[in-house]
Swiss-Prot record:
Name of this chain's protein: SPbeta prophage-derived uncharacterized membrane protein YotH
Keywords: Cell membrane, Membrane, Transmembrane, Transmembrane helix
Membrane topology annotation: Multi-pass membrane protein
Keyword Magnesium: no
Compartment list: Cell membrane
One Gene Ontology cellular component annotation held by this UniProt entry: plasma membrane
Transmembrane regions: 2-22, 32-52
Origin superkingdom: Bacteria
């Protein structure tokens, strides 16, 4: 469980912090990227909470 939480934290944390280089052809995907960034922040936060809770049981 802790290992899975670490993987989720790293992957979705990097995704949440990443910047997308959007060209004119990709502007229709901006809403999807914004939504994914918000989801990624929540997933990373939950994973961090699981890790924190697991370390201090």
């Amino acid at each position: 469980m802790i290992v899975t939480a670490w993987i989720l934290l790293i992957v979705f944390g990097l995704f949440a912090l990443s910047d997308f280089d959007l060209t004119e052809n990709e502007t229709k995907h901006i809403k999807f990227f914004i939504l994914m960034k918000f989801v990624s922040v929540f997933i990373a936060a939950i994973a961090a909470g699981v890790i924190w809770g697991g370390l201090f049981q």
